[in-house]
């Protein structure tokens, strides 16, 4: 059983802790997708490579949204347009796609935990290079 969620229950939002961002930094045209994944870890690559993962039920839970980071360290809750139903057994892969195409200085990072040694990220530019889980 997942932390606070049982099989068949819906996930309708997610929270991230943003750190080091300039006040009122804007993230435009963002998309978040969730997938069931049977593997217990992500390959140790310098960028997301989902080709060797067994993904199912990939769902765009929110797309084309804008986000403003109000302070340099802040928890932000993102409510999904479409809830994701967890199957009760698989892990969940969260894919965040920045489809804005531009960037500005004063961007920061999203806090993580050192217990997640198999996480990865890759900056991508241009719509044709966006990883597709």
Residue ranges and their predicted role:
Residues 10, 24-30:
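Short N-terminal amphipathic alpha-helices
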Residues 10-15, 40-42, 53, 132-133:
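Small cysteine-rich, disulfide-bonded extracellular modules of the LU/uPAR three-finger superfamily
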Residues 19-22, 108-109, 128:
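Intrinsically disordered, low-complexity boundary segments flanking structured domains
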Residues 28-116:
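Aromatic- and Gly/Pro-enriched, solvent-exposed loop/edge beta-strand patches characteristic
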């Amino acid at each position: 059983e997942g932390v606070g969620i049982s099989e068949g229950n819906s996930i309708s939002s997610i929270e991230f802790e943003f750190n080091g961002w300039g006040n009122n930094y804007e993230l435009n045209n963002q998309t978040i997708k969730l997938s069931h994944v049977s593997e217990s870890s992500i390959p140790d690559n310098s960028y997301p490579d989902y080709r060797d993962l067994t993904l199912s039920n990939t769902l765009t839970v929110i797309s084309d949204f804008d986000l403003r980071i109000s302070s340099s360290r802040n928890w932000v809750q993102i409510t999904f347009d479409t809830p994701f139903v967890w199957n009760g057994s698989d892990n969940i892969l969260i894919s965040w796609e920045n489809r804005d195409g531009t960037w500005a200085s004063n961007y920061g990072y999203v806090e993580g935990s050192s217990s997640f040694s198999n996480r990865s990220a890759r900056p991508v530019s241009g719509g044709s290079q966006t990883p597709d889980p």
